[in-house]
């Protein structure tokens, strides 16, 4: 396996992407937040003491995607063109599926920005609800889709 974030001496380095041509890059990442059905109903109905949980989490996810190079040491600062955070609420399972989509015309992919956005949106849901339910879980953080660059399209298969 080739790890391109290390030089021949084993030192961590930022990958040089200056020779690459910018292409449209898209990445979609997700995270799952688990909670009691009662808490999910309160979030859905806007009944949380701290306010609009999903609205605040959406803003946190957008901000996090834009701040990725400040959080992940070897990621490149990118001119992100679009970040969207959306949700699927499953009352039966007591889960919120957070999805973050990032687009940019860049020389490197936006997977880490999408993963960071989904993760921080999920953490914000936890933060705003922890007073009501300490058993909230966050997990299943994963890349769902990416396109752009020479590696082409990646789409996670169901159950993968």
Swiss-Prot record:
Signal peptide positions (record): none
Pathway: Cofactor biosynthesis; molybdopterin biosynthesis
InterPro entries named among the record's database cross-references: MoaC (IPR023045), MoaC_bact/euk (IPR047594), MoaC_sf (IPR036522), MoCo_biosynth_MoaA/MoaC (IPR050105), Mopterin_CF_biosynth-C_dom (IPR002820)
Superkingdom: Bacteria
Entry-linked CDD domains: MoaC_PE
Keywords: Lyase, Molybdenum cofactor biosynthesis
Catalytic activity: (8S)-3',8-cyclo-7,8-dihydroguanosine 5'-triphosphate = cyclic pyranopterin phosphate + diphosphate
Main enzyme class: lyase
Function: Catalyzes the conversion of (8S)-3',8-cyclo-7,8-dihydroguanosine 5'-triphosphate to cyclic pyranopterin monophosphate (cPMP).
Family the entry assigns: Belongs to the MoaC family.
Self-association state and partner proteins as the record states: Homohexamer; trimer of dimers.
Name of the protein described by the UniProt record: Cyclic pyranopterin monophosphate synthase
Upper taxonomic lineage: Bacteria, Pseudomonadati, Thermodesulfobacteriota, Desulfuromonadia, Desulfuromonadales
């Amino acid at each position: 396996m080739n790890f391109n974030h290390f030089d021949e001496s084993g030192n961590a380095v930022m990958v040089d992407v200056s020779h690459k041509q910018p292409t449209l890059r898209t990445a979609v990442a997700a995270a799952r937040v688990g909670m009691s059905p009662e808490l999910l109903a309160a979030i859905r109905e806007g009944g949380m003491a701290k306010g609009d949980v999903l609205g605040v989490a959406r803003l946190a996810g957008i901000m996090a995607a834009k701040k990725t190079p400040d959080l992940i040491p070897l990621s490149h600062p990118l001119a992100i063109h679009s970040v969207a955070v959306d949700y699927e609420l499953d009352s039966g399972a007591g889960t919120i599926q957070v999805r973050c989509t990032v687009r940019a015309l860049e020389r490197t992919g936006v997977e880490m920005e999408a993963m960071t956005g989904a993760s921080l949106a999920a953490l914000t849901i936890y933060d705003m609800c922890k007073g009501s339910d300490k058993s909230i879980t966050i997990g299943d953080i994963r890349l769902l889709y990416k396109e752009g660059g020479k590696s082409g399209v990646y789409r996670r298969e169901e159950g993968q």
